[in-house]
UniProtKB/Swiss-Prot annotation:
The keyword Cell division applies. It comes from the Bacteria. InterPro entries: MinE, MinE_sf. Belongs to the MinE family. It comes from Desulforudis audaxviator (strain MP104C). Prevents the cell division inhibition by proteins MinC and MinD at internal division sites while permitting inhibition at polar sites. This ensures cell division at the proper site by restricting the formation of a division septum at the midpoint of the long axis of the cell. This is Cell division topological specificity factor. HAMAP family: MinE (MF_00262).
Length: 89
């Protein structure tokens, strides 16, 4: 049935929302003049620095650009497992 809906041009709400979110991210990147490669590099460096002081959960890590009040904001959600002791740093 899903195949038939796609064939007739009826997308599932999930794929529509995914496409909308992808377009939103592309527009934000364009407005901020930051390429996806630069954002990935920034994410890697943030993880590298924070990992010196904290044990983080890489799987739950999210770094994105968001449009807030006519400005672009870098938003990082970094789950912390535990703090490293001073002796471990």
């Amino acid at each position: 049935m899903d195949f038939l809906a796609r064939l007739l041009g009826r997308e599932s709400p999930g794929s529509k929302n995914v496409a909308k979110e992808r377009l939103r991210l592309v527009l934000i990147h364009d407005r901020a003049d930051i390429s996806p490669q630069l954002l990935q590099l920034l994410k890697n460096e943030i993880v590298e620095v924070i990992s010196k002081y904290m044990e983080i959960d890489d799987k739950g890590l999210e770094v994105s650009l968001e449009h807030v009040d006519k400005q672009v904001a870098l938003v990082a959600n970094i789950p912390i497992r535990k703090m490293k002791r001073a002796a471990n740093i």
